Swiss-Prot record:
Name of the protein in its database record: Aquaporin NIP2-3
Cross-referenced SUPFAM superfamilies: Aquaporin-like (SSF81338)
Entry GO MF terms: channel activity
Entry keyword annotation includes Isomerase: no
Length: 301
């Protein structure tokens, strides 16, 4: 019985996330802590409200607020006067704010900023299901606040950065699926695999958002995010094709996460890994650099 329990724990830990909960990776019991967090056996208060959940939720509110404020603000100004900001400028603004928020809040909450991303991480066991509702509430709250703040400060602009199809709905749906697939594929690579780019993770994801939104913008608006679409739609009372921006990102993120999970190399069992392999790629690279520097100083002495 004990052997089977250990086997189940090890198989679960293989799928645990390496970036979204750094508090579980310290010390020799990292594997057991990760298993307890991601697959709790009981529904105690500690399971439902794990340590630092409130800080993670606030982090998601702030990150999503700033994401929507920048992207919808740029889109609003472009829609009112395209001489002041171009389509390319919108795409660059979107990519940059994603990059900045990943570096600012990635070590706290994972910087999801997107309900579809949270759903996909949970489906592929990189994020605990029990925290998904809290993240969704935070993301939609941050997005709504940003949209209504923009509506107040950008008067008399009536349409606050809404995303609507410019042609047939299936064209917009196809574009949203493809561009969100691209974003999630890159995100899975840099957020769940410690062998990926590490310190450049934020730049990689931001670049993916920027590049794909350049050509997706004229067709669908390049949303890639249900919260980013719903909030300005409510603030502007414009709901044209709203279903596209829920279905497209969900299909795109799930398929992107599945493809990366399928093609990535299998790693050694978690029990055989040193504890440093449980760390996020961000933190692991820093620790390796510090260790190398310390070794050089020791050799010098």
């Amino acid at each position: 019985m004990a052997a089977s329990t250990t086997s189940r724990t090890n198989s679960r830990v293989n799928y645990s996330n390496e970036i979204h909960d750094l508090s579980t990776v310290q010390g020799g019991s990292a594997a057991a802590a990760a298993a307890a967090l991601f697959y709790p056996d009981s529904k105690s208060i500690a399971d439902i409200f794990p340590p630092h959940l409130g800080k993670k939720v606030i982090s998601e509110v702030v990150a999503t607020f700033l994401l929507v404020f920048v992207t919808c603000g740029a889109a609003s100004i472009y829609g009112e006067d395209n001489a002041r900001i171009s389509q390319l400028g919108q795409s660059v603004a979107g990519g940059l704010i994603v990059t900045v928020m990943i570096y600012a809040t990635g070590h706290i909450s994972g910087a999801h900023m997107n309900p579809a991303v949270t759903l996909s991480f949970a489906c592929f066991r990189h994020f605990p299901w029990i925290q998904v509702p809290f993240y969704w509430a935070a993301q939609f709250t941050g997005a709504m606040c940003a949209a209504f703040v923009l509506k107040a400060v950008l008067q008399p602009i009536a349409v606050i950065g809404t995303t609507t199809p410019s042609g047939p709905h299936w064209h917009a749906l196809a574009i949203e699926i493809v561009v969100t697939f691209n974003m999630m594929f890159v995100t899975c690579a840099v957020a769940t695999d410690s062998r990926a780019v590490g310190e450049l993770a934020g730049l990689a994801v931001g670049s993916a958002v920027c590049i794909t939104s350049i050509f997706a913008g004229p067709v669908s608006g390049g949303s890639m995010n249900p919260a980013r679409t719903l909030a300005p739609a409510v603030a502007s009372n414009v709901f044209t094709g709203l279903w596209i921006y829920f279905l497209g990102p969900v299909v795109g993120t799930l398929s992107g996460a599945w493809v990366y999970t399928y093609i990535r190399f299998e790693e050694a069992p978690a029990a055989a890994k040193p504890d440093t392999q449980r760390l996020s790629s961000f933190k692991l690279r820093r620790m390796q650099s510090q260790s190398a520097l310390a070794a050089d100083e020791f050799d010098t002495v």
